[in-house]
Amino acid sequence: MSKPLNWYLTRHPLLYQIRFRLVSKKTSLKAIEDFCYNDINKKNNISTLFFEINNLIFTETNNKLNDFEKATTIAIWLKNNIKGGAGLGKSSTIALQKMMNGEGGVCSDFSQIYSNFCVINDIKVKEWGMKNLSNDPTVSGGHSFNEIYCTKFQKWIMIDVAKSIYLYHKNKDIPISTLEYMHLKKEKKEIAIASINANGSVINNNAYNIFLLSNSLPFVITNYDNKMYDYFLDKLDFFPVSIVHGILILIGKGYFFEFPKE
């Protein structure tokens, strides 16, 4: 039996391959280090729902937190209050609504809404994707996570909200950045995974498989204008999300997957 048209428009592997090739490029380490999601996406372009939820995350006692503490507080709250589920592929506002209602949310959904919470809390942030090559079908494919800039450590650090983890090297007090992670993995040096939660939540084995065992190729997602994407995803919601993304790519308004070039 032939597959329905909707499958070909949303899940056909060839469409993913074409899109991946169109948006992928190699970029210098300095350009990747300098990129920041906040440069494109400003506070006043983030929907009011994020500010409303932000008031639930932070109380008056949180006012004096540093950027690392704020970033951790947001990540813990989201993980504790969103059970996750199927991928959403909606505008950031609709995605947040659905996630809060227990209607889904995968790693890319967590990364997207986390980026917006970072913006409204003056935390510099990036969204990363990762192409994973593995014989394990639960690992092979893709994954999303974030990076935040911590003035406390004077560096970017990886944070995976969906998995609720930081990554470390020998110094267990300072998380590593994505570029450090790539270098350490290439050199086959020690990388440790630790829970964001102070209570030491059990780390899912899938996190070890994704970050330590698979052949991973991280890329930073750039040129993502959240306000513009939200507008088109809402206005063209009768189209499959892959078609909406494809339209924006073809008119030169799409995002890029930028792979570090050493």
In which residue ranges do the predicted regions lie?
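Alpha-helical transition-metal enzyme core signature, strongest for iron centers
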Residues: L78, C107, S111-Y114
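Short His-Asn-centered micro-motif
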Residues: E103-C107, W128-M130
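Hydrophobic/aromatic-rich core segments of domains that either
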Residues: Q112-K189
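Alpha-helical and coiled-coil interaction segments, frequently adjacent to or embedded
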Residues: I176-E262
